[in-house]
Amino acid sequence: MRHLFFVLLFFASAVQAANKIYSPTVKTLTTIVNNDWQNRPVMELGSADILYIDFDELSHDARRYICHITRCEADWSESSDVFESDWLQGFNDYPIDDYQHSLNTTVNYTHYSFQIPNEQCRIRMSGNYRLTIYDEDMGHEKVIDAEFYVVEPLMTIGLSMTTNTDIDVNKSHQQLAMILEYKDLKVIHPDDEIYTVVMQNWNEQTARVNPPSNYRYQLGMKWDHQRDLIFDAGNEYHKFEVLDVSHPTMGIDRIMWDGSRYQAYPFTTTLRRNYLTDKSANGAFFIRNSNSTEIDYTCDYVWVNYQLDAPYLGEIFLLGQWTTNADPTAYQLQYDATNLCYRAQVMQKQGYYSYQYTTREGLSAPTEGNFFQTRNKYQALVYYKGLSDRTWRLVGYRGLEAL
């Protein structure tokens, strides 16, 4: 029972890692390492990796935004036992000076962008990092929190997946097995020195934190037939593209101008009773339009109208890497008892979007079904804190796509 409490305690902490937007006038936060838009941002320490951060503010009034970086522990609590000079080379709290006003769009916005490392700062220690953006014109108001990871691959992670699980065989679940090799790092008490996080499609709400290992030996640890590493298989993500406001594109039934804004209508979704074979980006999104030029400030904003035909099945939410509003009700579908359907309207920038319907806890909604064939992506993060160390370092990262 004590171990279960420990896992649940840190499960709640892991949820805090998600990107969040706090201002109603800030939209479309993206954090991309190099060109890997389908993954969360993971940088390798000492490499040439670049983290690109972009967002929009819904006006043509240039604002003074300040970026502050905070180093966090494995559970995303703020690091308190290391100095800023231990992990940051350069200066913190620097202004975001690179911005561009939108061009030929029906919604005015200003696009802001910057990157890490830059002339002001460079990260010099592995671990979890939270980037906070403040609006100086609004009295140092916090408008954005964004997460990123910096890994130094000092340990080796082996990760595999099977649909022949300890619950069922080729039905509704997927089970992971994991092997960790310490390599040159000295581990005496794994319970105190090793911290592991395993996620499905980067969903922090359903992360498995410190699942108990079955085997421990001098050179590593092994997780095999571990029920804590069994995940609901879910179904493929929904997807659509809004590339041109003059006509519908992939996944869009119709798009129209209502006199003041563009309204886009993805095809109505119904209960999924079978596996959907259409591959998607597992919650990722990518801003683009049919012109493919200067997309950062030429893509327009449209109001996307979601409809899910189903009997009432409790609260249902949209979930993707783009659902970053700090208020989760911004993505809650409202039930229409007259027409027996769920509906939501969300303001989104032109581009490709993938998403799923979930419960408030981040689990797949009853409308989606669970099918062993689903091509989920899994992520394993391993942190190390030696007995004399002051902080957790991220020493291993491994991704796996279930095919």
Go through the PLM ranges and name each one.
Residues 87-113, 204-213, 303-349, 362-388:
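Aromatic-rich carbohydrate-binding modules that target alpha-glucans
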Residues 106-136:
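Ligand-binding face of N-terminal immunoglobulin V-set domains in extracellular IgSF glycoproteins
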Residues 192-275:
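Long, internal scaffold/assembly segments composed of regular secondary structure
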Residues 1-19:
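Bacterial Sec-dependent N-terminal signal peptides
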Residues 265-312, 392-403:
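Basic K/R-rich, polyanion-interacting modules in nucleoproteins and related proteins
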Residues 61-90, 188-211, 313-324:
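Extended low-complexity, serine/threonine- and proline-enriched intrinsically disordered segments
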Residues 150-171, 373-396:
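Low-complexity, Pro/Ser/Thr- and charge-rich linker/hinge segments at domain boundaries
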Residues 25-71, 169-180, 291-306:
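Contiguous beta-strand segments within globular domains
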